[in-house]
From Swiss-Prot:
Belongs to the archaeal flagellin family. The lineage of its organism: Archaea, Methanobacteriati, Methanobacteriota, Methanomada group, Methanococci. Flagellin is the subunit protein which polymerizes to form the filaments of archaeal flagella. This is Flagellin B3. Disulfide bonds: none annotated. The gene is flaB3.
Amino acid sequence: MLLDYIKSRRGAIGIGTLIIFIALVLVAAVAAAVIINTAANLQHKAARVGEESTRQVASGIQVLKITGYAVNTKNITKLAILVSPNVGDEIDLSSTIVTISNGDYKASLVYGGQITYVNTNGTRDIFNESWPNIANPTTEFGVIVLQDADGSMNNTEHPTMNFGDKAIIAINVGDVFGGIMPRERIYGEVIPEFGASGIIEFRAPSTFSEHVVTLQ
């Protein structure tokens, strides 16, 4: 009878051990599934963040040159900012903001819907003949299209720059903060909807010996 009890006891212990083993296997399987799912989510998030970071770094707009127009050789009243997109996504100028400051005032300008196209026939006078008629020059900028191979900037509501396109952002600084005086320091940014901003930073020459003045 004792022998039967011992055998029964061993059998119960064996079944208990088997149950514990199965439970451990199930727990391990659930844990593995959770880890795999978490890893997949993290990988997806990392890929998305990487794509967004690449987009921010690769795309954007660059300021190639800034030229001013001094109507009386004493005060610059017009500013022509030559811009082009970086390698990356296209740039919608209708969603672009230009900030500009002389230290005393800081203005934020938006696209006003005025475009002049000189990419086909050229122009002999950007600052007068081809200058866009900006309706609200204190708060808006116009656009002069210089290079647009695929016609992506023909839409006046959403002029869109692709890689290789070049345009001038036209600002009437005489209306924004009274113009730019000799030796005056100007700084700001051309801020696209996505990507890196173009930098505006220059100090005007001590004298304006000509009407057209290279600033940056």
